[in-house]
UniProtKB/Swiss-Prot annotation:
Quinone reductase that provides resistance to thiol-specific stress caused by electrophilic quinones. This is FMN-dependent NADH:quinone oxidoreductase. The keyword Oxidoreductase applies. Belongs to the azoreductase type 1 family. The gene is azoR. It comes from Gluconacetobacter diazotrophicus (strain ATCC 49037 / DSM 5601 / CCUG 37298 / CIP 103539 / LMG 7603 / PAl5).
Amino acid sequence: MKLLHLDASILPEDSSVSRTLSAAVVAHVRALQPDLTVTRRDLVAHPLSHMTLANLPPDHPASVPGNEVERAESQAVLEEFLTADIVVIGAPMYNFTIPTQLKSWLDRVLVPGRTFKYGPEGVKGLVEGKRVIVALSRGSFYGQETPYATAEHTETYLRTALGFIGIATPEVIVAEGVSRGEDQRAAAIEAAHQTVAALRV
């Protein structure tokens, strides 16, 4: 079984909630699945450039010859995603949405003809049988009962993007309010770890 582990926090693991949680998810899955092969992609330590026609994966219909090194890397990112059985994404909320580093990764993964296709009846996702677990951190509270509910564009964006390519039910583990005092931070992290511990393979 292959697992792809992505992190997009600009903070180091000892101070990043999303990195800590994504690492906990990977460790938990590894304990339950000893034959697991893990590929790690740190999107901050090794960022992908923003999307251009010249660095799209060659499989993308809009791709044109350009930076062949980046095109090859983009193709490798796509294949890495497609061959993984499980994808674990560590994603903090930055300014109400996902980090740009994670957006650049998604731009390599949402590829017409490979992960989705258009047809007379609309869009059809082509990614089947893949499990995605998102470890998400938010500094404040963005639930439906809060004044900031409409400002939540991290979980909603990821659910939309993943659903678009056929991953209709990603598992999202949220540590919320982690910037609202030490007690709240500790409680949110503990609750998230309990959710991680309940994951089944």
